[in-house]
Amino acid sequence: MVEKIESLLTEMEFYCSEKHPAGALLLTGEWGGGKTYFVVNKLQPHLKDSHIFIRISLFGIKSVNELQASIKKKWIECIADYIAMSKIDVGATSKVFNALKPFAKACVDTFIDTSVPEGKQGIAKSLFSISADQLITITNEINGKIIVLVFDDLERSSIPFGELLGCINEYVENQHFHTIIIANENTIKKRENEHSGASETLKYNEIKEKVVERQLEFHNDPLEI
């Protein structure tokens, strides 16, 4: 089992390090199997020096607009946290600001001395004081670190799968984000068959093929987590 987990970690690390991924990575497995735990507590720490992971739970999200707003909010939270918690000097902080254009100037205008902890707290506060919808275009890299979007609970979203996967594909294909989708695919197919018939399941599979570059099955021994 350890070998399987290590192999899975290697495959996911390879995907996250691809220069130009052709699609998303789908990690599927049964509920309670440890998929999210694996990504958050194994993969993320393993790549902490080169990647920033942004996890968005799709549970309870009812529209594409709500999802897009949630992604922007999570992006700002992660970047603000990165700036506030990193041991970076003023020069390094300036490089981050350059990457955070066009709202960097609005932040700088409100900052105090950024070389002290209070200044770093000011960075986070300033980021949250800005209207993300109006001023921000999220980027797939920040200060040399690759951003990985993690969409969790695919099967628990209220958004029709066609719209949902189409939205995710926008980040994958057009904005070139490394993207991990965590799902219980058996539940998705069962639900589609029960409520919409086989044609809808086929539709899900067809759309998935356009969005997903590779699919990995997660089978974990509870004793391993």
Residue ranges of each PLM-predicted region?
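Short, conserved catalytic or adaptor-binding loops enriched in Gly and charged residues
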Residues: 45-47, 204-210
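P-loop NTPase nucleotide-binding core
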Residues: 24, 29-30, 36-40, 46-144, ...
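Phosphate/oxyanion-binding active-site loops and adjacent basic polyanion-contact surfaces
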Residues: 1-8, 34-35, 63-68, 157-161, ...
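Conserved nucleotide-binding/hydrolysis micro-motifs of P-loop NTPases
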Residues: 22, 32-33, 60-63, 184-189, ...
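Conserved small helical "lid"/interfacial subdomain of P-loop NTPases
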Residues: 210-225
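Conserved Walker B catalytic segment
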Residues: 133-186, 190, 194-196, 200
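Pre-Walker A adenine-sensing motif
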Residues: 1-22
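Short, well-ordered alpha-helical packing segments
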Residues: 13, 43, 68, 72, ...
